[in-house]
Amino acid sequence: MADDAAPHADVLNSTAQGQLKSIIDRVERLEVEKTEIAEQIKEVYLEAKGNGFDVKILRKVVRLRKTDRAKRQEEDAILDLYLSAIGEI
């Protein structure tokens, strides 16, 4: 299998090979950072839970804050309309 890979390396010139290696290295570094950040976020939620906060609601607040206020208000109005239509509110 290794012998099959060697001829393909000749297809790319040395500049393209360097760029490809650089791109792959950067993606791999970012994947490591993403994993580390995800672990830090998890720790923050555990801390919040330890302080008595509802983590499910905190996650919802974070998600809602990412949404444009006008879009969120429109979605809330439609949700209220649907809930009202089925007698839930």
Swiss-Prot record:
Signal peptide range in chain numbering: none
MF term (GO), any: DNA binding
InterPro entries reported for this sequence: GapR-like (IPR018753), GapR-like_DNA-bd (IPR046367)
The organism's place on the tree of life at top rank: Bacteria
Family annotation (Pfam families): GapR_DNA-bd
HAMAP family: UPF0335 (MF_00797)
Annotated family: Belongs to the UPF0335 family.
Protein name: UPF0335 protein Caul_0876
Biological source species: Caulobacter sp. (strain K31)
Lineage: Bacteria, Pseudomonadati, Pseudomonadota, Alphaproteobacteria, Caulobacterales
